[in-house]
Amino acid sequence: MHGNASALHTAQNAARCLDAFGAPEDIYVYPGASKPLIRPTKHDPEIHGEDGLGGVEGLNAADAPSSLTRFVLDDSGAPVRALEGMAKSIKVAIAEGHKVVVVSCGPCTNIALFVSVYPDLLKGIEQFIFMGGGVGLGNRSAVAG
């Protein structure tokens, strides 16, 4: 995913927050798209800080072992990306007779890519829930609500 910070930082932030909140160890982070589909990439470090969390204190470092174990690695040692992680999870759910709820926050680039690349897997999705995107001016300010 991209948005208020780079895809790398937002993935690291997700892993750090899961660790801080004591989430079960079998909840993983799959880094998403590194750029928007159409417009140029834009981050706002003056609003959200370089890492996208704006100076939040008390989280483990991004390279802490407990954060790094939140990433599933492929055979080359690179993190498995969101599209592949979503596809695998949804295929398992379908095989077990279940459906998933996809929750997305921020830009919906990964959802758009998933729907385009894996239309056959939409049958395994019960609903999409999202907080993100904007029409017109968007939410690019320190006081956007």
Which residue stretches match the model-derived regions?
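Histidine-centered metal-binding segments
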Residues: P45-E46
